[in-house]
A protein has these predicted regions:
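Short, charge-rich amphipathic segments
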Residues: 27-38, 56-64
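Tandem CBS (Bateman) regulatory domains
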Residues: 1-15, 54-87, 93-103, 118-142
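A glycine-centered beta-loop-beta connector
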Residues: 32, 40-57, 101, 109-126
Length: 142
């Protein structure tokens, strides 16, 4: 059975890529491509998470106008991000967070301090590393 005392603080990304809700979607797309990530946390002016923008959200933003041949001007992140966003704190248990992310089909969760300010992010990849690092007595590598 898993040793379940591993906490989010041990595996969170401490400097996640961020965008503002009022940012141009193409600026967010550049961030996603340049950092080779599948999405970003969207924050307000106080670094409080207000949404998540995924690659699929970005595709939807691009296709929503171009498919119909519409001139859209500036497409804002806030119009396509997933919101509201569920956040977690640094002391939450890795296994509990992994189960919640799986149940809600989410690839990332913002980590906030006691005032709701973003201090990090946990991703599915980070959770996989955490679970790999746990003691699994019956598992033999192949």
């Amino acid at each position: 059975m898993f040793r379940t005392s591993v906490r989010i603080r041990d595996y969170m990304i401490r400097r996640p890529v961020l965008v503002r809700a009022d940012s141009d979607i193409f600026d967010a797309i550049r961030q996603i491509i340049n950092h080779r990530i599948s999405g970003v946390t969207v924050v307000d002016e106080h670094r409080k998470p207000v949404g998540i923008l995924s690659e699929l959200d970005c595709l939807g933003a691009i296709l929503s106008g171009s498919y119909y041949g519409e001139e859209q001007g500036v497409i804002k992140v806030e119009d396509f991000m997933t919101s509201p966003v569920e956040t977690i704190n640094v002391d939450e248990n890795i296994i509990d967070v992994a189960k919640s992310m799986l149940d809600h089909k989410r690839r990332r969760r913002p980590v906030v301090d006691e005032n709701g300010h973003l201090i990090g992010q946990v991703t599915c990849r980070a959770l996989l590393k955490a679970i790999r690092d746990l003691d699994i007595p019956d598992h033999k590598p192949t």
